[in-house]
């Protein structure tokens, strides 16, 4: 995916470096290796395309564009109107009919599209919102950053089965904070 199309032209020469870059409104586009790691975790143990995926935190739209090649359908929700509009503009070039951009509070997910085979978040909070777990299909997987007891963030994988959920805490990461509401 052409990452330079998702950052400001002044930063285009840094688009392929393994670094996060500002995208406006105090938000960033994640490092390419972090995006790759999260998608790898989302797909681990699964073959073929993922079914319906919910992405929380559209940002500039880059990860939604990558997800469009891995999933049958992508619902991506952004709480900041300015970024929602920027993502819409960025994605227009690619004409991805399986990507649905939503403006709203990602902490409540998007119940109309549920259940999801996978949920991925680009912002981290103190806990995984219950709405996400409820909207995750049985057999589904959720990958998100979450604050640990030490106050740091770590990637968390949640697998949902008929018996319940299993949470695995992985490596340290640094994401923008997960916030409720819209702006």
Predicted regions and their residues:
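Glycine-rich beta-alpha junction loops
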Residues: 1-2, 148-150, 173-174
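N-terminal auxiliary segments of SAM/dcSAM-dependent transferases
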Residues: 1-11
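Short clusters of hydrophobic/aromatic residues that line enzyme substrate/ligand-binding pockets
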Residues: 6, 16, 21-23, 110, ...
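Conserved alpha-helix/loop element of class I SAM-dependent methyltransferases that forms part
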Residues: 10-20, 25-52
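Conserved nucleotide-cofactor-binding alpha/beta core module
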Residues: 39-166
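Short, solvent-exposed aromatic-acidic interface loops
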Residues: 169-179
């Amino acid at each position: 995916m052409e990452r330079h199309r998702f950052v400001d032209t002044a930063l285009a020469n840094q688009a392929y470096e393994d670094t996060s870059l500002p995208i406006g409104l105090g938000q960033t586009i994640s490092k390419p290796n972090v995006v790759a790691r999260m998608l790898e975790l989302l797909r681990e143990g699964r073959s073929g395309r993922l079914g319906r995926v919910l992405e929380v935190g559209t940002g500039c739209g880059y990860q939604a564009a990558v997800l469009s090649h891995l999933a049958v359908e992508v619902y991506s929700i952004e709480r900041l109107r300015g970024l929602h509009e920027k993502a819409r503009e960025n994605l227009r070039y690619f004409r991805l009919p399986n990507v649905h951009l939503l403006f709203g509070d990602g902490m409540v997910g998007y119940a109309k599209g549920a259940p999801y085979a996978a949920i991925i978040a680009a912002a981290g909070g103190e806990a995984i919102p219950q709405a996400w777990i409820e909207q995750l299909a049985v057999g589904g997987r959720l990958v998100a950053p979450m604050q640990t007891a030490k106050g740091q963030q770590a990637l968390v994988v949640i697998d949902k089965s008929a018996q319940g959920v299993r949470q695995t805490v992985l490596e340290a990461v640094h994401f923008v904070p997960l916030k409720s509401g819209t702006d």
